[in-house]
Amino acid sequence: KSLGSCAMDGNRFPKLKYRIYQKALWVPYSQQPGVALQSHWNYSGIQNIDAWSNCPYVELFINKKSYGIVEPDQRTRQCTWRDIQWEPGTVEAVGLDTNKHPVCSEKIESSDKPYAIEVTIEKPAAKPTGEEFILKANASDAFIVTAKVVDKDGHWCPWADNLLKFEVEGEGIYKGSYNFYVTEGKDLSYHAPGDTELQAEGGLMRVAVRTTFKPGKIKVKVSSDGLISGESIIKSKKIKH
């Protein structure tokens, strides 16, 4: 989805490459130590676990049990622990300095079956001064809404592909999303612009909502059969003349 070389997909969801860059792994660890784990921990059976770090060493823990210390490849900064038996819980990669003392870490957790939908209105872009833009009732300002499928404990379900139904109430106009779901046995899944029913991709989906000329409350609700619905509210402001 999107160009393979891109750090983000068409819905602006970060790929693993984005997180690796975000950790500033190209600078010396003495300036900014960082470690990035693989995207999730939900495949069963025997598997390899990958992490990337600018530290001299990285130690892997699964449910607080150590699986050894690895030196990252000098060129790619990748380190791999092979033939690890999957078990539910928490995976942690800890970056170590030359004396093998911890200097940074990252955790990922396995998740249970899909249970609910979390709905988040993304923060608007900021001005050069750091001040956030105000959502104006000018019929052109828009905002991004993220729907995330989670388990009963609130953990993201990265394999979820539930059909999500979006509803907008109040002074907002639904503008749709980028959706090009690809899965085994279903190579392509197109949708018409403005479709309110979209299939989650990796347990996630994003849509755009535009303001009207009337200021007021905008509610976005997302539902799916068998899941607890979620919603979020934002207010558009009157234009000052």
What is each of the regions a protein language model found here?
Residues N54-P56, L60-Y67, S105-K107, A142, ...:
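Short flexible loop/turn segments that cap and initiate beta-strands
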Residues W86-T90, A142, P215-K217:
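Extracellular Ig-like/FN3 beta-sandwich strand-entry sites
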Residues G216-E231:
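Ser/Thr/Pro-rich, low-complexity mucin-like regions
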